[in-house]
């Protein structure tokens, strides 16, 4: 009998896609899922404003001199902040998009052992970090270890 179920990576990436629908960012909807070694979901996160602040979808983006929105907390950071540090150790982060270099540093600092994502970042800045953490891209539903 053939098992037609999605792999764990596909399963959690699909959940990350659904989580991204809660994003309040006008530019890009990002979702992520933080998963323990035994495949239990520890937390989810999406990009949006900090608690109590106005959302970009309501007030527009609050941009700095470089044109980047400073109101938004990234999905990865929202998930990491939702979990006690001892639970994050050796976990896997599934994300709709490749984490930026700032989130990547936080991911490594949090003790997360692996990142699996769908949409690559437009530059290869994270190639530097791939020697410190397992980095997997699902590009066109094909798994590529980086």
Cite the ranges covered by each PLM segment:
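Zinc-dependent deaminase catalytic domain
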Residues: 1-146
């Amino acid at each position: 009998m053939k098992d037609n179920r999605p792999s764990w990576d596909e399963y959690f990436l699909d959940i990350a896609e659904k989580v991204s629908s809660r994003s309040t960012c006008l530019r890009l909807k990002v979702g992520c899922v933080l998963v323990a070694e035994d495949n239990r979901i520890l937390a989810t996160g999406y990009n949006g404003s900090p608690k109590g602040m106005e959302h970009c979808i309501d007030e527009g983006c609050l941009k700095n001199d470089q044109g980047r929105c400073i109101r938004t907390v990234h999905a990865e950071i929202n998930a990491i902040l939702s979990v006690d540090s001892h639970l994050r150790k050796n976990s896997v982060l599934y994300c709709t998009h490749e984490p930026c270099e700032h989130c990547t540093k936080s991911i490594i600092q949090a003790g997360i052992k692996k990142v699996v994502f769908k949409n690559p970042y437009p530059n290869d800045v994270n190639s530097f970090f791939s020697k410190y953490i397992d980095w997997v891209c699902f590009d066109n539903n094909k798994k590529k270890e980086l």
